């Protein structure tokens, strides 16, 4: 299978004067994740969704992240957002093979110290995002107005994405889900299954490894990518 490295750095540099990273945390913001998504989508041959296709909602103005916790000096809290598709597309999430669906956003996290857990309920070994309602703007798999891709209210791209990831994928995955029937997120730190078997059983068509480089360089679980049997 073909493999490629997506040049996200160039896209982020072009928007370096915008709030693409939190001041008090090591993660990118939803805006930063969006620009990363655009670079990835273009590399995949998808037409990226435009910012205007989402409604940005501020969910917290009191986010103090990991950098603040380590440094311990006073800092202005960060603002957290979620972006909702204006076309009405809806998803549900299943965490660690749970039988009952949950939302993509953990509202209770906003009242806790770990507010970043708001995005996809934090770190799970396995997360599945399923589309339950397709949008009504006529955009097909590539967001290019392909009405023929709509069937019975669902977008039938026939493709499944697996993101092998760290927590940087938590705010990225909802954007990627615009182009797939299902998106799986595998965190190798907590995933104890056989990865190759999982990919085959779920019929995964596309794989993305998404990591923050400093974390990936010292991550001791990536050997599982090459594990067989």
Regions picked out by a protein language model, each given a short descriptive name:
Residues 1-229:
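Extracellular glycan-modifying ectodomains
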